[in-house]
Every structure is written in structure tokens, then in C-alpha cells.
Amino acid sequence: MAIKDWHEDDRPREKLLKFGAAHLSDAEILAIFLRTGTQSQSAIELARHLIEQFGSLAELLAAPQETVLACHGIGPAKYAQILASLEMGRRYLDSQLKTGQGLGRSQMVKDYISTQLRGEPREVFAVLCLDNALNLINFEILFTGGISSCSVCIKHVLRHALSHAASQLIIAHNHPHTDAKPSTADNLLTYELKKACDLIDLSLIDHVIVGRNETLSYAENSLPPFN
């Protein structure tokens, strides 16, 4: 049965407008962006199949272009719609952080960093430069490593922060193929960078790790040196 023949309260778009986004499944949200299915599948059936194939909506959004385009029912137009939805979310979060509206909420910071780093095939290290009011001045990936490690130069991080006149920093990196649990090397880098920042009156306020399926904040979890 085509979606247009469903009861109004079950159609994704009508359900979204009537009950709100929280009442929609990942497949229903994705179906709204896909708009149409295939000859044998409705948009929701196609969305469910894609999510099952990749394991989650997050995994689908992080997958390489060629992998998604190889899926039955996904052509350049549908893939462009998926990318546009992801970019719209990124830009919304970016605008929130640049006006200081989101940095008082750790979830907003984690969401922003997650959208920036999830999908990177290699480990990368990024820095968010902030002013005294927690407005985002600059976000930049400073270092790119291999599949499971990334070398970081603390002096370069400090020079980068000073060049943007930052008074506060959040650092972030990803674990592209594992969970977000900090490694011993992660903890040591955080401690050394915090100590270096303190020497020049620069506040390191968090270290965020984006894992394969979750995001961890040192500050939110009171991990050293933020305990």
C-alpha cells in the first residue's frame, strides 16, 4: 500500500506536523527526506531497509558516498537530499554555538562535534576556539592520523588558539572504528594540554571523543583533569 493511502495519522509528514518529531522513528524521519521509494518499496520501507543495512541512522549518514549510492533505490538525487539534511543540522548547530546559545549545554556541544567528526575514516584532532562568553570563534581539524591514532603537537594547538584570540578551548577527536572510551594516550594528552593552557591563562574546558556510536565529554563525566 502506498503511503498516500495510509491513515493520515500514520503518514510521516502528517504525523510530524500533528504530534512532533519525537513521535517519529528514524525510518520515518529519513523517509520524509527520501520523499519517494521504489517500484516495490514505499519511502518508509526503503528507509527501514537502509537503516538495517548500515546498522543505524548514524552509520548511514557517516557512510562514504559510493557505498550509499550502491544501495538499491538510492540515486544521486536521494543521496543529495540526505546530505542536505545533514548539512542543515550542522549549520543550525553552528549558528547556535556562534551566538553562545548552545555552549552552556553539553549536549549541544557534543551534537555539534559529532556532526563534524563522525564519518571521518581516520582519526582526527579538532579544536574549538571560544571567547569569554562561550561564543564559538573557530572550529578546525588541526591533525589527521591513521585508523587508530593521531599525533598532536601541543605547541601548534596553543599557537592556533592564540591566533584566534581564544580565551577558552574545547578539544575533540574521534575513534572511527571503536567506542568513545578514552585511552591512556587520550588521558595523557588531555592532562598535558590542560597544563600547557594553564601556563598561558587559556582555559581548556572539555575534551570530547566521538566514537562509532556515541560521544563522550570529559567534563560532563568529571574525568581528570576536569574532576
From Swiss-Prot:
Short motif (JAMM motif): ranges: 173-186
InterPro entries the record matches: MPN, RadC_JAB, RuvA_2-like, UPF0758, UPF0758_N
Q: Does the keyword Transferase apply?
A: no
Q: Name one GO molecular function term.
A: metal ion binding
In which residues is Zn(2+) bound?
Answer: 173, 175, 186
Q: Transmembrane stretches, by residue range?
A: none
A Gene Ontology biological process noted in the UniProt record is: proteolysis
Q: What keywords would UniProt list here? A: Hydrolase, Metal-binding, Metalloprotease, Protease, Zinc
Give the MPN domain ranges.
102-224
Q: Which family does it belong to?
A: Belongs to the UPF0758 family.
Identify the NCBIfam families for this entry: PRK00024.1, radc
Q: What is this protein called?
A: UPF0758 protein Pcryo_2119
